[in-house]
């Protein structure tokens, strides 16, 4: 899989305990300075890591977590962000070269070399990470186009967005808007 792991940072550490009180199937459990963290695998096989820490190095493995009382009105996480994505790539040097042209994404995309036929297939072939949409403050589309070179697939005629593909065939959509990042999966 192209998507190695989604790392989610929650605003309220206590909410992680509320989630754990529901006794989900977890693959790893940790204790950090702010509270507990855990890793789980989605039905689609995606690994999701949930934490509230400023520094992941502060996490220590746990065998189990005490169950807490969950407020009746707790429905789920109230506020969280995708901290970063671990993306599996077939050729680490090639992927690093591509992403070195996009320093604003360095905090979001952590590359790791892996093996597998599915790491370079098109989005329509497999259920996996297919697109990362980056909304920026108004930008000069020609500057981004020049940085990305031949990887650019489409430039909107009004210059408000462009689409490029990384070496793993993940589409990167750059759109003039609000400095946000969206992640999509293809079925």
Question: PLM ranges: what are they?
Answer:
Residues 1-33, 41-187:
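Glyoxalase I/VOC metalloenzyme domain signal
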């Amino acid at each position: 899989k192209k998507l190695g792991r989604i790392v989610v940072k929650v605003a309220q550490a206590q909410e992680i305990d509320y989630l754990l009180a529901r006794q989900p199937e977890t693959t790893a459990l940790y204790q950090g300075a702010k509270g507990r963290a855990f890793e789980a695998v989605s039905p689609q096989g995606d690994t999701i890591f949930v934490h509230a820490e400023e520094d992941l190095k502060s996490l220590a493995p746990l065998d189990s977590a005490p169950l807490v009382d969950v407020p009746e009105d707790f429905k789920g996480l109230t506020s969280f962000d995708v901290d970063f994505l671990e993306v599996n790539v077939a050729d680490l040097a090639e992927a690093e070269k591509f992403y070195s042209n996009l320093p604003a994404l360095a905090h979001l995309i952590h590359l790791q070399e892996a093996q597998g036929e599915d790491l370079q297939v098109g989005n329509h072939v497999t259920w996996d990470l297919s697109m990362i949409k980056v909304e920026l403050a108004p930008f000069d589309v020609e500057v981004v186009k020049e940085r990305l070179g031949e990887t650019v697939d489409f430039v909107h005629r009004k210059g408000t967005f462009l689409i490029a593909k990384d070496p793993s065939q993940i589409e990167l959509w750059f759109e003039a808007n609000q400095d946000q990042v969206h992640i999509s999966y293809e079925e």
